[in-house]
Regions:
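N-terminal catalytic or cofactor-binding beta/alpha core of small enzyme domains
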Residues: 1-115, 122-146, 168-175
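Short, positively charged low-complexity motifs
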Residues: 147-149, 155-166, 173
């Protein structure tokens, strides 16, 4: 059974470097049997490599603005990514990546870490560093959802619209 950890983000943009930091930690001291891919700010470039691995499980970790307190961690349903307003620094939306690989992967898990400061040349904030440490510490014994809560309307300022999907439409004007 192959498990792939895709770490996404830009280490030059403060808290958006959460994914790359996790990849560095795993490179220095691997946890469990994860194949770690540092997708950086263009994770779509790794689609072919992920497909070739035919992983049983793909865990995508990225700093994601969910409207929570900095450093909070939530599982986001991959089917909801496209319909949620999320700030992103990536070249392509992550739902594009998920759509490209979903037929070659047993299970796709998307783990968001709430950033505080995403700006060029800013340091990563302590709450996000701590959150990366929490994710790292759970990789070796990962079962099911890793012990992380799902993002739900009750846990964030999301509103539910349309087909029962979570969106951040009301937050568009606050950024």
């Amino acid at each position: 059974m192959t498990d792939v950890l895709l770490c996404v983000g830009n280490s030059m943009m403060g808290d958006d470097g959460a994914g790359p930091l996790l990849a560095e930690m795993c490179a220095a001291n691997p946890q469990g049997n994860w194949v770690v891919i540092d997708g950086g700010s263009a994770p779509e470039n790794d689609v072919v490599a992920i497909r070739e691995l035919h992983p049983e499980r793909l865990l995508i970790v990225d700093a994601t603005d969910m409207g929570l307190n900095p450093g909070e961690i939530r599982l986001i349903d991959p089917d909801d990514i496209a319909e949620m307003f999320m700030m992103t620094t990536h070249n392509m939306p992550l739902n594009y990546l998920v759509d490209q690989i979903k037929d070659d992967v047993g299970e796709v898990l998307f783990l968001g870490i709430q950033p505080d400061n995403v700006g060029f040349y800013y340091p990563m904030t302590p709450p996000v560093k701590e959150a990366v440490g929490v994710v790292y510490s759970r990789l070796a014994g990962w079962v099911g959802n890793g012990g992380f809560e799902p993002l739900t309307p009750a846990l964030s300022p999301c509103t539910v619209r349309g087909h029962g999907r979570q969106v951040f439409g009301d937050m568009v004007n606050t950024f």
